[in-house]
């Protein structure tokens, strides 16, 4: 390991942040403007001052504090072991030992003391840079030799892909010069000139004389150590102009060059440090820039191949594999493809750091749980799941109908903030691994489930039973509250109430369709008050029930009427003769249902009829609509029963949480079921194909209702107010998410 920790105090968006326990691969994610690039600025500034460069000072996070600090704690365990070994007594080894380890004048700071306390067999070295208001700086270690040596042993390289010259790869030479510890002291300049003179001169002395003439004319400063490294390496290879797959760089696309540049740089970084004690740090800002998603995946895959090639483990050993610690590689990304591949391929050798903003505007950094032991999850972990790590708000649902509902464009137009939420249909395997409650990402979320995932009711025994999820939730709630927490007593009381439900009898009526006195709505409300802490919301009914209720019933009837009037076409290529024939066969007053069924069907196209046919068709439709409404109100006792019949017809459940299929299997509510069956076969035959999940009725009904309300109300606020009255559960979920998103947006822009 290269770095043990980085601490930043009162600089840029950082109030006081400590990053520690780095892995070989460190993937940084987060929304724009949360401080990801500020980490790069801080590290870059620290190293610039380490190398005595003049750079623009960093802004303070708050001017109430007169100073800012950057503290790097380096892991010197390996280098100390090397330089204290009897085998290594070279000049540079002695210099390292005398500079870093022999002196007792270097005091340990708090981070170093903590690090030593936690690992007595390890060696650490901390260096703090203090920035003052007058732009002056102070180092915790005065000796410039120490700082220079740290810059040599732990070099820093950064790549901002948006700003690199994709046709000039010379920065790679700088990298190469930083990754070795060659000794040039024994290289005699005159001997080198004589050697070359002997090898390349056509006549003895020609090369030497040529060099002498050049030196007599020009005046140059001596090569630095790094320049010597580059020149000696270039002499030994066939050329120093980079090509990509044998082609000149200018002939390649920007994306191809960017990918190859990064691959080459990281390949060299890993390869050249396997037998060196220099431990570099590299930071790549948005490596995905200019890359196709599949090429972005290949970038991580190829990095993993070279990483694995040299890695020595108990299972993998042999020539060419080393236990040498890898460089610390950081890359910040907005790419789900890169994040996905990092998590899947690097396992425990990676970590994901999630940057977000606190309410006060300072940067928060959370280490995400990004290692998974569940191979089922890793097998299905795709870009769809990875993109949730970048979400502003996540709504986890349990069905395609919910996806259709919450992604409805008409709704999103009325609630623009909600359009920023990710709606995700998650099974239990994915939900257990990807929800922010597990990953520890600072992403607000809610898990929406039906109440029947918690409880089950038997019409025969008139008793509830608690499902496993309820038992699990009770355990989680108990853990969430401390015994002395002021809210513990209230939650404990609610938990006891929930547990008592299964031992009490709840009478039903109307053949088990409704409860007699028990209110499922009240139970759901009480559950949601305490489950909110677990980011869970349980709907009193299903999505079908939330859409079809007593408040929405008038709109549902109007929607059915709209389907009849606008979507039903004449079921014959000769409409004039056909409609006359059907009129003669069926009496419009006493046989309107068979007449309607014979004449009309749901049509994809809307042919133009003669005015006479239009009038005849409209008369039949209106007669049928009047008959349908009268029949519905005569067949059922009240609107509560009408709503239930429609819910069940469209795949919903009774108040006692029975579907039509379950009622049939248990032999319950036979008369009620028979009524629904008759409606499906006769009066509502044209809707029967839509009475299934994802058939499209949710979208068409919701669009119709919003359009209808829009025509009734004067502004969006009144439209939203009416929607909240008609669909209270649905809109409360949307409003809660919107409020959270708007608050987050405000903190980012404020």
From Swiss-Prot:
Ranges where the record places region ATPase domain N-terminus: 1-173
Cofactor remark: Probably binds 2 metal cations.
Enzyme class: hydrolase
Region (Dimerization domain): 174-260
Domain of life: Bacteria
Residues at which a divalent metal cation 2 binds: 402, 623, 641
Binding-site list for a divalent metal cation 1: 398, 450, 452
Binding site for ATP: 33-37
Gene Ontology molecular function, alphabetical: ATP binding; ATP hydrolysis activity; metal ion binding; nuclease activity
SUPFAM superfamilies: P-loop containing nucleoside triphosphate hydrolases (SSF52540)
UniProt-listed Enzyme Commission number(s): 3.1.-.-
GO BP term (any one): defense response to virus
Cofactor: a divalent metal cation
UniProt keywords, alphabetically: Antiviral defense, ATP-binding, Hydrolase, Metal-binding, Nuclease, Nucleotide-binding
Region (Toprim domain): 391-704
Region (ATPase domain C-terminus): 261-390
Function: Probable nuclease member of antiviral defense system retron Eco8, composed of an reverse transcriptase (RT), this nuclease and a non-coding RNA (ncRNA) encoded between them. Expression of retron Eco8 confers protection against bacteriophages T4, T6, T7 and SECphi4, SECphi6 and SECphi18. At multiplicity of infection (MOI) of 0.02 cultures slow growth when infected with SECphi4 but do not collapse, at MOI 2 cultures collapse. When the retron is cloned in another E.coli strain synthesizes msDNA (a branched RNA linked by a 2',5'-phosphodiester bond to a single-stranded DNA).
PANTHER family linked: ATP/GTP PHOSPHATASE, ATP_GTP PHOSPHATASE
Subunit and partners: Homodimer.
Similarity section: Belongs to the class 1 OLD nuclease family.
Protein name: Retron Eco8 OLD nuclease
Species in which this protein is naturally found: Escherichia coli
């Amino acid at each position: 390991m290269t770095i043990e920790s980085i601490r930043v105090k009162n600089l840029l968006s950082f109030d006081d942040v400590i990053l520690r326990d780095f892995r070989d691969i460190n993937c940084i994610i987060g929304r724009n403007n949360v401080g990801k690039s500020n980490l790069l600025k801080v590290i870059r500034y620290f190293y610039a001052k380490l190398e005595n460069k003049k750079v623009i000072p960093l802004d303070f996070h708050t001017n109430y504090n007169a100073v800012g600090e950057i503290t790097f704690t380096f892991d010197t365990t390996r280098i100390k072991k090397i330089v204290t070994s009897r085998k290594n007594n070279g000049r540079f080894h002695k210099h390292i030992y005398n500079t870093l380890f022999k002196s007792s004048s270097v005091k340990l700071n708090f981070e170093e003391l903590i690090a030593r306390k936690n690992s007595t067999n390890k060696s650490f070295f901390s260096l703090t840079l203090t920035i003052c208001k007058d732009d002056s700086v102070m180092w915790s270690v005065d000796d410039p030799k120490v700082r220079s040596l740290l810059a040599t042993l732990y070099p820093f390289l950064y790549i901002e892909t948006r700003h690199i010259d994709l046709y000039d790869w010379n920065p790679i030479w700088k990298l190469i010069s930083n990754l070795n510890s060659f000794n040039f002291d024994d290289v005699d300049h005159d001997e080198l000139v004589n050697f070359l003179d002997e090898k390349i001169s056509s006549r003895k002395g020609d090369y030497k004389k040529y060099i002498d003439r050049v030196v007599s004319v020009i005046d140059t400063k001596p090569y630095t150590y790094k320049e010597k490294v580059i020149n000696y390496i270039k002499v030994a290879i066939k050329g120093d102009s980079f090509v990509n797959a044998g082609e000149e760089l200018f002939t390649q696309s920007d994306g191809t060059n960017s990918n190859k540049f990064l691959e080459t740089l990281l390949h060299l970084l890993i390869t050249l440090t396997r037998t060196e004690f220099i431990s570099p740090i590299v930071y790549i800002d948005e490596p995905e820039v200019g890359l196709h998603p599949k090429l972005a995946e290949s970038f991580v895959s190829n990095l993993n191949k070279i990483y694995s090639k040299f890695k020595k483990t108990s299972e993998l050993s042999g020539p060419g594999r080393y236990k040498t610690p890898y460089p610390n590689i950081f890359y910040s990304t907005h790419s789900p493809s890169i994040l996905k591949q990092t998590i899947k391929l690097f396992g425990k050798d990676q970590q994901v750091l999630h940057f977000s903003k606190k309410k006060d505007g300072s940067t928060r950094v959370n280490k995400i749980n990004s290692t998974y032991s569940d191979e089922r999850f890793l097998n299905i972990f795709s870009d769809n799941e990875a993109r949730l790590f970048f979400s502003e708000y996540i709504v986890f649902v349990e069905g395609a109908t919910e996806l259709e509902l919450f992604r409805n464009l008409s709704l999103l137009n009325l609630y623009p903030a909600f359009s920023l939420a990710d709606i995700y249909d998650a099974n239990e395997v994915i939900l257990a691994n990807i929800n922010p409650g597990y990953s520890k990402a600072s992403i607000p979320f809610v898990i929406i489930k039906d109440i029947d995932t918690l409880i089950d009711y038997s019409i025969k025994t008139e008793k509830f039973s608690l499902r496993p999820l309820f038992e699990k939730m009770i355990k989680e709630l108990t853990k969430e509250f401390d015994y002395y927490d002021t809210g513990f007593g209230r939650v404990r009381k609610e938990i006891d109430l929930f547990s008592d439900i299964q031992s009490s009898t709840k009478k039903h009526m109307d053949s088990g369709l409704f409860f007699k006195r028990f209110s499922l709505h009240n139970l759901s409300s009480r559950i949601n008050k305490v489950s909110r802490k677990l980011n869970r919301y349980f709907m009193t009914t299903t999505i079908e029930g939330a859409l079809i209720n007593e408040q929405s019933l008038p709109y549902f009837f109007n929607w059915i009427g709209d389907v009849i009037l606008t979507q039903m076409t004449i079921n014959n290529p000769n409409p004039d003769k056909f409609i006359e024939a059907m009129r003669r066969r069926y009496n419009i007053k006493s046989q309107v249902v068979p007449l309607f069924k014979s004449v009309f069907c749901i049509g994809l196209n809307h042919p133009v009829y003669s005015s006479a046919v239009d009038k005849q068709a409209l008369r039949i439709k209106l007669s049928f609509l009047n008959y349908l409404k009268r029949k519905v109100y005569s067949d059922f006792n009240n609107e509560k029963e009408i709503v239930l019949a429609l819910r069940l017809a469209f795949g919903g459940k009774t108040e006692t949480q029975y579907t039509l299929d379950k009622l049939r299997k248990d032999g319950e509510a036979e008369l009620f079921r028979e009524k629904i069956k008759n409606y499906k076969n006769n009066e509502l035959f044209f809707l029967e194909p839509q009475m299934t999940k994802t058939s499209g009725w949710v979208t068409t009904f919701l669009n119709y209702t919003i359009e209808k309300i829009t025509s009734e109300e004067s502004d969006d606020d009144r439209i939203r107010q009416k929607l909240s009255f008609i669909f209270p559960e649905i809109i409360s979920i949307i409003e809660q998410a919107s409020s959270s998103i708007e608050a987050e947006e405000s903190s980012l822009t404020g």
